[in-house]
């Protein structure tokens, strides 16, 4: 059964759910550019006001995946995405990007899906460019990068070209909509495991259940109670874990892993170059908060990737990857590999 955009808008005004097949239809209209900007703006605003349901988000993510340019990775064992929704307003250096190098050095395969900074001073694409990585790769080149280096960066605009049909609407609205939470749900390489940071506590339970509906294997959705979309050193972290089809929600604390609780204030950066310096300092094993938070997040990602049996074991593997110099070497490896495709 199809639904007209006008009927969908009325549904949101009445705070009623848009059903799965209806949401698929509406989202396809948006992604094809077949819905007027006025109606698209009204519907995504209406969804935000009534609060998007797990079913609506899962359907929207399904369509975004349909329209994506996919990266084919034949072996998805120990294959993980480390990603945040962004929008936490913390302006920290790129913790998840730093964690990618450590996680790959410790034996996982990482498909990092990211973009330039919008709410942050430095998005993952910005800091990778500052490091010398060529982010403008075709899907087959990203697949080769994962096979060769254990890491691949998927620059979102290259993989989600249909998003251009809603870009102007989103820009003009200037408020968060369903599209702000779809990015981490739509990894073009289809990584079955994920460490996903979110910008609000309510999203922990929502996003992990969306991933459950989308057929993911092992996912940890995290929210630092100090407002970070990462596993935090400055507060407890809420975790929603999907494993073996079951969801469990719990809290973790830095002290659980022998880490000191410290403020994340020292992790703030003003631009991509400052982020690059802090990232390299952490990977060069310089003692401090940056190294510790990367170790904590990479350890959690190694658990999500099923390389480690627990977060604690993952942290130990992450420490070894940094101390041995293997994590730092991964930066140079990715730079070298991606530069051969420079156009």
UniProtKB/Swiss-Prot annotation:
Annotated EC: 2.4.2.18
Cofactor: binding comment: Binds 2 magnesium ions per monomer.
Entry protein name: Anthranilate phosphoribosyltransferase
Family statement drawn from the similarity comment of this UniProt entry: Belongs to the anthranilate phosphoribosyltransferase family.
One Pfam family this sequence matches: Glycos_trans_3N
Pathway: Amino-acid biosynthesis; L-tryptophan biosynthesis; L-tryptophan from chorismate: step 2/5
Catalytic activity, reaction form: N-(5-phospho-beta-D-ribosyl)anthranilate + diphosphate = 5-phospho-alpha-D-ribose 1-diphosphate + anthranilate
UniProt entry keywords in alphabetical sequence: Amino-acid biosynthesis, Aromatic amino acid biosynthesis, Glycosyltransferase, Magnesium, Metal-binding, Transferase, Tryptophan biosynthesis
Presence of the UniProt keyword Secreted in the record: no
Cited function: Catalyzes the transfer of the phosphoribosyl group of 5-phosphorylribose-1-pyrophosphate (PRPP) to anthranilate to yield N-(5'-phosphoribosyl)-anthranilate (PRA).
Binding site for anthranilate 1: 84, 115
Enzyme class, broadest EC rank: transferase
GO molecular function list: anthranilate phosphoribosyltransferase activity; magnesium ion binding
Amino acids binding 5-phospho-alpha-D-ribose 1-diphosphate: 84, 87-88, 92, 94-97, 112-120, 124
Positions contributing to Mg(2+) 2 binding: 229-230
Residues engaged in binding Mg(2+) 1: 96, 230
Record-linked InterPro entries: Anthranilate_Pribosyl_Tfrase, Glycosyl_Trfase_fam3, Glycosyl_Trfase_fam3_N_dom, Glycosyl_Trfase_fam3_N_dom_sf, Nuc_phospho_transferase
Subunit note: Homodimer.
GO BP, sorted A to Z: L-tryptophan biosynthetic process
Residues annotated as binding anthranilate 2: 170
A GO cellular component entry from the record: cytosol
Required cofactor(s): Mg(2+)
Organism: Burkholderia vietnamiensis (strain G4 / LMG 22486) (Burkholderia cepacia (strain R1808))
């Amino acid at each position: 059964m199809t639904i007209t955009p006008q009927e969908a808008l009325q549904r949101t005004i009445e705070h009623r759910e848009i059903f799965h097949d209806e949401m698929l239809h509406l989202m396809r209209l948006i992604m094809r550019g077949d819905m007027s900007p006025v109606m698209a703006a009204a519907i995504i605003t209406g969804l935000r006001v009534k609060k998007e349901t797990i079913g609506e988000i899962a359907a929207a993510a399904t369509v975004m995946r349909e329209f994506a340019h996919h990266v084919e990775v034949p072996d998805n064992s120990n294959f993980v995405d480390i990603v945040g929704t962004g929008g936490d307003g913390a302006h920290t250096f790129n913790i998840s990007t730093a964690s990618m190098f450590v996680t790959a050095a410790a034996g996982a395969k990482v498909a990092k899906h990211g973009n330039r900074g919008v709410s942050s001073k430095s998005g993952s694409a910005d800091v990778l460019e500052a490091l010398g990585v060529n982010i403008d790769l075709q899907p087959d080149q990203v697949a080769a990068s994962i096979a060769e280096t254990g890491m691949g960066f998927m620059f979102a605009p290259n993989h989600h070209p249909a998003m251009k049909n809603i870009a102007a609407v989103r820009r003009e609205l200037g408020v968060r909509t369903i599209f702000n939470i779809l990015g981490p749900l739509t990894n073009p390489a289809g990584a079955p495991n994920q460490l996903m940071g979110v910008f609000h506590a309510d999203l922990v339970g929502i996003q992990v259940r969306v991933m459950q509906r989308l057929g993911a294997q092992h996912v940890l959705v995290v929210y630092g109670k100090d407002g970070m979309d990462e596993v935090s050193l400055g507060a407890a972290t809420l975790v929603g874990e999907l494993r073996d089809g079951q969801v469990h929600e719990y809290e973790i604390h830095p002290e659980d892993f022998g880490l000191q609780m410290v403020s994340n204030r020292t992790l703030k950066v003003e631009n991509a170059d400052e982020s690059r310096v802090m990232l390299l300092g952490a990977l060069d094993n310089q003692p401090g908060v940056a190294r510790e938070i990367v170790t904590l997040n990479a350890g959690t990602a190694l658990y999500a990737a099923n390389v480690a049996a627990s977060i604690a074991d993952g942290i130990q593997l992450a420490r070894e990857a940094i101390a041995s110099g293997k994590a730092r070497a991964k930066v140079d490896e990715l730079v070298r590999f991606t530069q051969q495709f420079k156009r």
